[in-house]
Amino acid sequence: MSLPTLIILYGPDGVGKSTQIDILAKQLTADGHTVKKVWLRGPHTMAFLLSRILIKAGRTRHLSNPFGRVKTLPDIGTNPLIKQLWALTEFVSVLPLLVIRVILPLKLGYHVLADRYVLDVVVSTAFYINDPNFIRHKISNILMGFIPTSSVLIHLDADYDTLIKRRGNLVEPESFIDFQKNGYALLSQRVPTHYIDTSKLTVDETSEAIQGILRNCKG
């Protein structure tokens, strides 16, 4: 089996995704592979503009991390139709990005390394509309369909204390991290994933764990 053409790293901020994507890109390039790095999360374009409008209008909710740093989010409210509209807006916004940044490069023979992908879009959207059930929504199912069966998905994780040490006052609020982790756990039941807890691993040890997964996938 050849090297997977789409390699996806996902997980909370602070687990080392970007660092590992950079290391992997250098390794694959040195081995003669043509590589493209991508990043997807949300909100995108129209959904982002809508969030700015709601925040400007004072429709907000606030979360804070242990350092008192406040994360301001649009308050979508509880109206199911508005939640559906937000989710649909995000879907329409991210669709062309998926085609341009991922699908076309794959068709052109690139190895695409995704620092976040549709799993993160689904979880992010669910969080913005404050609805964990969105993870089972038909829009989520369509987004998950953009994961080719030959892809390798690697969930990088770390406990919250480790994230605090790594991110300092930039660490995301714990409630947001908990929401992400619960969402990832649900999505991992739908697609084959590999899990690495980076809490007690060095950068090199995490890289070697990723390389081991890819070696096994190549057969």
Regions found by a protein language model. Name each.
Residues D161-G219:
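NTP-dependent small-molecule kinase module
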Residues Q20:
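Hydrophobic positions on the alpha1 helix immediately C-terminal to the Walker A/P-loop
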Residues L9:
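Hydrophobic anchor at the beta1->P-loop junction of P-loop NTPases
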Residues G42-N130, F134:
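ATP-dependent small-molecule kinase phosphotransfer cores
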